[in-house]
Structures are given as C-alpha cells and as structure tokens.
Curated annotation (Swiss-Prot):
Protein name: Uncharacterized protein aq_1201
Coiled coil: 15-53, 86-103
Origin organism lineage: Bacteria, Pseudomonadati, Aquificota, Aquificia, Aquificales
Alphabetized UniProt keyword annotations: Coiled coil
Protein's organism: Aquifex aeolicus (strain VF5)
Amino acid sequence: MSLTSSIRDKLYCMAEKKISEERRESTTQTAEELKVPSMEKELEELRREFFKFMEFCIPPKEVRDEVMKNLYNIPLSILKAFRTILDYEIKVLEERVKETERKPKSRRIAVE
C-alpha cells in the first residue's frame, strides 16, 4: 500500500503539530518548574533581609532573659510608683486632718 502524497503531507503536518504542541507544553512545564525555585529563592532572600533588619531590634540571647525579666517587672514598678504617690498623698491629708483636730477654736475673752 502506498500512500498518496497529499495523505502523507497531512500526516506529516499532523505529526509536526503534535510535536510542536508537546514542545510548548514541555516548555511551559519547565517554565513553571523554573518559576517555583526562583520564588523560593526570593522568599529566602526576603527572610534573610527581614532577619538582618530584626537583628537591630532583638537583643542578643545573652541579654534577652534580662530584658524579658525587666519587661515583666514594668507593671510591678509602675504599681509601686503609684503606691508611693498614694502613700505620700494620704500622709499629707492625714497631717492636715490632725492639724485641724488639734487646734481648738480660739475664744475671745471678754474684758470688763
């Protein structure tokens, strides 16, 4: 059986189309595969830059415990300061009350 030239040409064109489509698919797949690592690399670079920036904000490990202890003690220190101020104000008010209680009202003595 011999194929006519027109059928042979059609089969050849179909084969070329199929091959070109497979190539396109493979290139898009490889392009997608290439994009994923590049995104991972970009993400890794962003992480590194973020940690470099945060190094200035976060104290070193040796000091971190002391800083955390001080952060926990801040509310206690504030409350102690308020207590001291309140104690002083109470003392001042108590002294004023005692002074008013001590002083008897002065009476005028009638001179004849």
